[in-house]
A protein has these predicted regions:
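Active-site neighborhoods and metal-handling regions in enzymes and metal-associated proteins
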Residues: 1-211
Length: 211
């Protein structure tokens, strides 16, 4: 993973009416993914070659770039290449992501159902082990959640680091238990669990308060 808790790769994509070039760490692209991309007319190039590519582009193009967010080095190269005309505008992909189609909505629902099953199994195990007198900590919460989520064949990665906060720790903003600093769970009080996962069909973010 290029970004923690995110199953995506850092990349640039240069798209024109006649070609598409994906700049990515090609060593991380599986043969299956490479074949699929090439079948769809997408050429792979190394991530670090994007600036050199843009500087050498000779085909006249008007390039849409969201200037408030685009990498400044990329923007400079675009501006300095006489073959390229930069047009500032909102990334159309962001606009499209803001409105889900029926397939995306259905997949999101299935991801949440799948995650709910993992959450129920987690709570059953947590309660039964506490009732049996076992010593559990905030770190144990993370371990149990990961066990049930990762057992699903569509699981990819946690969508963020699990926040398991018992008692007074739940009042701390973005609290995170560590091996050096964590609380032991008791059969009283409150346990706040903020967690989520990314599956092939959707991403979840679940906040639970367990008494």
């Amino acid at each position: 993973m290029d970004i923690e808790c995110t199953p995506y790769a850092m990349a640039y994509c240069y798209v024109t009416p006649s070609r598409a070039v994906l700049f990515i760490n090609t060593a991380r692209v599986t043969p299956e993914a490479k074949a699929e991309l090439e079948t769809n007319g997408i050429t792979l190039a190394e991530y670090d070659d994007v600036l050199k590519f843009l500087a050498a582009e000779t085909e006249p193009q008007t390039v849409l770039a969201e200037c408030s967010t685009v990498n400044y080095a990329v923007y400079q190269v675009l501006e300095q290449n006489p073959a390229l005309t930069v047009k500032d505008g909102t990334d159309p992909l962001l606009m499209m992501k803001g409105v889900k189609n029926e397939t995306e909505l259905a997949h999101t629902k299935q991801a949440h159902i799948r995650d709910a099953v993992a959450m129920v199994r987690f709570q059953i195990e947590l309660e039964s082990r506490l009732a049996a007198g076992e010593t559990l900590t905030e770190l144990t919460v993370d371990e149990i959640l990961h066990k049930y989520r990762s057992a699903d064949d569509k699981f990819l990665v946690e969508s963020f680091d699990t926040i398991a906060a018992y008692g007074g720790n739940a009042a701390m903003m973005h609290y995170h238990a560590t091996p050096e600093d964590h609380a032991v769970l008791q059969r009283k009080g409150f346990l706040l669990v903020d967690s989520g996962a990314t599956y092939l069909d959707g991403t979840t973010d679940i906040l639970s308060l367990i008494h």
